[in-house]
Swiss-Prot record:
Changing R100A: Partial loss of ability to recognize apoptotic cells. Partial rescue of the engulfment defect of the deletion mutant tm2078. Retains phosphatidylserine binding specificity. This is Transthyretin-like protein 52. Changing P54A: Reduced ability in identification of apoptotic cells but can partially rescue the engulfment defect of the deletion mutant tm2078. Changing W65Q: Monomeric with defective clustering of ced-1 around apoptotic cells in the embryos of the deletion mutant tm2078. The keyword Signal applies. InterPro entries: Transthyretin-like, Transthyretin-like_sf. It comes from Caenorhabditis elegans. Changing L55A: Reduced ability in identification of apoptotic cells but can rescue the engulfment defect of the deletion mutant tm2078. Disruption phenotype: Loses ability to bind apoptotic cells and results in reduced ability of cell corpse engulfment. Homodimer. Interacts with ced-1. Interacts with nrf-5. Expressed in the intestine cells. One of its GO terms (molecular function) is protein homodimerization activity.
């Protein structure tokens, strides 16, 4: 058994690096909260790679906080197994902007178009007081 590991362990390590693809992404945007304009300051924003395979969890690609005007820029890299399998990025935004109807605050998840560097994903205005079920 130990001989097997000695001979084949380097192969498995090498093949994992060869068969995975690393991609990096940058996303920018401006957070808006019409119900409380001050709530766009220092908002926690995570960039995640969704892994839908069984026994895999999503990977944190990057993290940032918005500035006092709600501007943010988040960058990160992720690797997915397979030469044609690219990361599936999304933003997870934890905020304190009250919903325009109910005053509740819920985190927002936004799928990001997988445009990898050198391209930049420009999200424009991201309204924190509206949710998908509003539309």
């Amino acid at each position: 058994m130990s001989r097997f590991l000695i001979y084949f362990l380097p192969f498995f390590i090498y093949s994992g690096n060869v068969l995975s693809k690393t991609s990096c992404l940058m996303a920018t945007g401006v957070l808006k909260c019409p119900t409380d304009p001050e709530a766009v300051k220092k908002v926690h924003i995570d960039l995640w790679d969704e892994d839908s395979l069984p026994l895999e969890s999503d990977d944190l690609m990057g993290r940032t906080w918005s500035d006092r005007n709600g501007n943010f820029q988040v960058t990160g890299c992720a690797s997915d197994f397979g030469p044609i399998n690219t990361p599936d990025p999304y933003l997870y935004i934890q905020h304190n902007c009250p919903h325009r109807d109910s005053n509740a605050t819920n985190p927002i998840q936004i799928d990001v178009i997988p445009l990898f560097l050198p391209s930049i994903v420009r999200l424009g205005n991201v309204y924190l007081d509206r949710y998908l079920e509003d539309y």
